[in-house]
């Protein structure tokens, strides 16, 4: 039987602002990426997110981003590898400490937004992030875009690497995600998106925007839980994966 992890970005509310539908999405996933206070979240939300995932028996991952609350961490910033390492270590240490205080530990780390995309193409940036993770916990799993520099850097650092794919995003021939401003960036047809996931998991290929099939490794599928439609999609993708002999389980069970 095939295995895959379903992950979602959570804990992105802060102060009086509520973002996402965490309570409804948590039971549907196997790994949670919790924001660490830079692009979103705050200490209270972080603790609440840990409590919710613990109660549901879901594995916790840190979701560090750039220090850009106004831009939700989606705007590129000119940062050095040294800054990337410090930003990462600062955020995962905060969330990791809260996890420890609640009898939990971080399973994985997945950078957020612009930091994720920048690192996917920049080996030096990826290496700095992975060095921070290795310094924090050499057993932690690094989640990054399948085939990216982040995956290469993780392996070079001796870390466990989990290749992530996206159900609702288009791919370029080089394996990178199509820019959101370009045509073909988003897969809006649910059945098409799910069929692509099944193919990525079982066949290890995905069709790029050019129409060419490219190789891809699918250890984890990112799903979004903001909005009722997205919630229904997650329920549907779980059902179809199970019907196609794909077992949904946390990264720790897949990467080992």
Where are these regions (language model features)?
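Flexible, glycine/charged-enriched surface loops at secondary-structure junctions
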Residues: 99-107, 204-215, 245-254
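Active-site-adjacent beta->alpha loops and helix N-cap segments on the catalytic face
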Residues: 15-21, 40-52, 120-127, 146-155
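Glycine/small-residue-rich loop that forms an oxyanion/phosphate-binding "nest" at active or ligand-binding sites
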Residues: 68-108
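Acidic (Asp/Glu)-rich catalytic clusters
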Residues: 23-27, 48-61, 100-102
């Amino acid at each position: 039987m095939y295995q895959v992890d379903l992950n979602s970005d959570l804990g992105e509310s802060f102060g009086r602002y509520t973002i996402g539908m965490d309570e409804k999405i948590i039971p549907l996933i196997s790994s949670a990426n919790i924001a660490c206070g830079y692009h979103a979240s705050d200490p209270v939300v972080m603790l609440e997110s840990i409590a919710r995932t613990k109660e549901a028996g879901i594995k916790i991952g840190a979701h560090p981003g750039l220090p850009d609350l106004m831009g939700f961490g989606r705007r590129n910033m000119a940062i050095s590898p040294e800054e990337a390492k410090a930003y990462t270590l600062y955020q995962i240490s905060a969330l990791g400490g809260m996890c420890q205080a609640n009898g939990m530990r971080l399973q994985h780390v997945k950078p957020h937004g612009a930091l994720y995309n920048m690192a996917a193409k920049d080996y030096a940036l990826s290496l700095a992030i992975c060095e921070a993770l290795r310094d924090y916990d050499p057993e932690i799993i690094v989640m990054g875009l399948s085939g990216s520099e982040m995956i290469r850097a993780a392996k070079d650092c001796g870390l466990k690497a989990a290749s992530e794919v996206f159900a609702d995003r288009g791919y370029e021939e080089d394996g990178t995600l199509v820019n959101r401003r370009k045509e073909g960036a988003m897969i809006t047809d649910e059945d098409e998106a799910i069929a692509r996931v099944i193919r990525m998991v079982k066949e290890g290929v995905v069709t790029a925007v050019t129409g060419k099939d490219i190789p891809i490794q699918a250890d984890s599928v990112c799903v979004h839980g903001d909005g009722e439609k997205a919630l229904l999609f997650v329920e549907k993708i779980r059902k179809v994966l199970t019907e196609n002999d794909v077992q949904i389980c946390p990264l720790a069970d897949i990467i080992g």
